[in-house]
């Protein structure tokens, strides 16, 4: 195996960012397009229900950004894009990511998250990409017991998935590792905890709480609400991804966590309090099938090797996030009404 080891130092590089109109990907686009004006960035997104062109529309005014509508599973489209653009780096944010949807319809998760990853890596090999980065999730590790707060996920924690979603992401991670070992594709993988911040599609916990509470509707909470998640602000996550892409060791996995564990019920109560809404809006509903108990990440590898650190604590980050939603209620309304689907005219 010959691996094309390459450290990115910036300057006149061309990046493909897949899934760049989604929540995490669009925040990443805003971060890198403004931070690295000397580099070129192409965003590829299929604009499925969770992809919103409005998230990145203003970036098209920048000289170093271009949007392309397309699906990562479309082998012909992807190959032509690689041929035309001659990418140096590929960062794959594109994914079906809602656990509940994966329980109802696993097939699309396998297609997008595994086959789509294969299509991107085949093109990366064919066209000599210098670095392929896979954005993954801590859910591939399964869950941790609630009564063992000392336990954390490390990069050596075995994969032990609970849902079709996490299984599809784990399958993609294993395939990425296989392409590194078998074909010498220079890869890195990041696994993050639960993200929050601006532009999050209102199907995930925090924007669901906001949109329901603002309408004085019942806020659904699975089970007893005691399941624990580690929360990381999307900006901190994306800074970590950028450091891994540019300085991470080829073939390695890096965990990125927020060190901010909260029960789901605590998160709900925190947001209701900030909005001045009554806890009477909370409605406990039947628990999710196979609901993971607790996620908690050890990020010491990224901290020590790459100098990565979080800048947001949960209290400040959630306040800033809710303030953003309050200031951008038209964005929320466009999504809830479906009007956002008409934003892209290309």
Model-based region annotation:
Residues 3-195, 320, 325-331, 337-346:
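N-terminal Rossmann-like NAD(P)+-binding domain of SDR-like oxidoreductases, especially those catalyzing
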Residues 27, 54, 80, 101-104, ...:
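Generic recognition of short, well-ordered alpha-helical segments
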Residues 147-148, 202-210:
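A glycine/serine/threonine-rich, flexible loop-to-helix segment
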Residues 35, 41, 51, 70, ...:
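C-terminal substrate-binding subdomain of Rossmann-fold SDR/epimerase-dehydratase oxidoreductases
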Residues 117-118, 170-177, 207-210, 238-239, ...:
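Conserved active-site helix of classical SDR/Rossmann-fold NAD(P)-dependent CH-OH oxidoreductases
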Residues 18, 111-114, 165, 169, ...:
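Short, solvent-exposed loop/helix junctions and linker helices
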Residues 79, 121, 177, 209, ...:
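Short glycine-/small-residue-rich flexible loop motifs, especially phosphate/cofactor-binding loops
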